[in-house]
């Protein structure tokens, strides 16, 4: 299987998001990379499902709460910028203050 660097990145994010979901199910608080991966995966999959940029910007800020991440993680992440493929092309989605 020959994957482009972008496809490899998408696959890595998807796998990290799966690990993060399993940890949340067990009640384990997420670290920085896990939180980023989970929110990124949510936006990428939402774009694939046909949701709008504005909708994903808003919804992406409600994927995780402060109680679901390790102490200090919410303060470390001010914005997440995700390049996602929508039905009408690739767009940049910025989620402001994603962990509230």
From Swiss-Prot:
A cellular component term, taken from the record's GO annotations: cytoplasm
Keyword annotations: Cytoplasm, Hydrolase
Gene3D superfamilies, per database record: Urease, gamma-like subunit
One MF annotation (Gene Ontology) recorded for this entry: urease activity
Enzyme nomenclature, EC number: 3.5.1.5
Catalytic activity as recorded in UniProt: urea + 2 H2O + H(+) = hydrogencarbonate + 2 NH4(+)
Family recorded in the similarity comment: Belongs to the urease gamma subunit family.
Pfam short name (any one): Urease_gamma
Keyword Hydrolase in record: yes
Name listed for the protein in its UniProt record: Urease subunit gamma
Single Gene Ontology BP annotation: urea catabolic process
InterPro entries (alphabetical): Urease_gamma, Urease_gamma/gamma-beta_su, Urease_gamma_sf, Urease_subunit
SUPFAM superfamilies for this protein: Urease, gamma-subunit
Record bears the keyword Hydrolase: yes
Predominant subcellular localization, coarse grouping: cytoplasm
